[in-house]
Amino acid sequence: MDEKTKIYDITIIGGGPVGLFAAFYAGMRNASVKIIESLPQLGGQLSTLYPEKYIYDIPGYPSVRAQELVNNLIQQMKPFDPTVALEEAVQSVEKQVDGTFEIITKKDTHYSKAIIITAGNGAFEPRRLDLPEAEQYEGTNIHYFINDLSRFSGRRVAVCGGGDSAVDWALMLEKVASSVAIVHRRNAFRAHEHSVNNLEKSSIAIKTPFIPTEVLGNGDKLTHITLQEVKGDTTETLEIDDFIINYGFVSSLGPIKNWGLELERNSIVVNSKMETSIPGIYCAGDICTYDGKVKLIATGFGEAPTAVNNAMNFIDPKTRVQPMHSTSLFE
């Protein structure tokens, strides 16, 4: 059986922190695992929205930087070598005659004996730069995601936005880029006060209150942007190599609403086994709901093993739901 038709034991839809931990735990249960993620990188909101922010309610960490937590989770699951499919938004899930699930994305078709949905608040789509010519340069040097800082080494970069993501990325880029400018339509930034203080002390050129009104290029890549002062007459042209847009993201259940699952207020209803209304499909993390549900990363970390253990029992009813403790497994 080739990779395209391989039937995995467990397919995890959503590569955020809960999905990563579920992949690790499923690996401990000797399951073959695939993660399908709609974004270009693993980590979900932690990597996309606030990679440099500190999280204070993860057990065992007095504080941990969001991206560091993601990196640790990826490292934790690596020994089990799960298959990862990035930039694939799941469009439909269908149960086949033989009981396996067919999972269709915009790019491919996947097969699995059980599914765990860990999609957080749903699929993310960036709010795009609404200017003529902008779409032409998306994917070359207009960016909505950063998954490799080194690609900006020695380059002139402009960041557009005023929230945590924009300020965080500008500060990170300052360490590698030859120059960084941040463009925001208001004088005040919405980012965390500590980050704004660091921004004001940095070498980053702060362009406020300005908005981009034109992007100029040579047909192959963007070379300049024109800025217009909000409620003013001042214009400015910046010569840049890369333009990073941080206007935020829109998340929704999207196609999940059409999969036949019981829903309640844009969440998937589960029972105490983390089982949905469709046998063989489980949920963990913010996307699911039950009486008394608390939406925290720490809660999702507890739900993931419950989902995995019950999924394994669904695949093979002779399999114990309660596994051995990890101290015994790794001796």
UniProtKB/Swiss-Prot annotation:
Lineage, top ranks: Bacteria, Bacillati, Bacillota, Bacilli, Bacillales
Cofactor remark: Binds 1 FAD per subunit.
Sequence similarity: Belongs to the ferredoxin--NADP reductase type 2 family.
Summary of subunit composition and partner proteins: Homodimer.
Protein name: Ferredoxin--NADP reductase 2
Residues reported in the UniProt entry to bind FAD: 37, 45, 50, 90, 124, 286, 327
InterPro entries, sorted: FAD/NAD-bd_sf, FAD/NAD-binding_dom, Fd--NADP_Rdtase_type_2, Ferredoxin-NADP_redctase_2
Lineage top rank: taxon: Bacteria
Reaction catalyzed: 2 reduced [2Fe-2S]-[ferredoxin] + NADP(+) + H(+) = 2 oxidized [2Fe-2S]-[ferredoxin] + NADPH
Single Gene Ontology BP annotation: cell redox homeostasis
UniProt-listed Enzyme Commission number(s): 1.18.1.2
Disulfide bond residue pairs: none
Cofactor section: FAD
Gene3D superfamilies for this protein: FAD/NAD(P)-binding domain
One GO molecular-function entry: NADP binding
UniProt keywords, alphabetically: FAD, Flavoprotein, NADP, Oxidoreductase
Keyword check for Cytoplasm: no
Pfam families in alphabetical order: Pyr_redox_2
Enzyme class: oxidoreductase
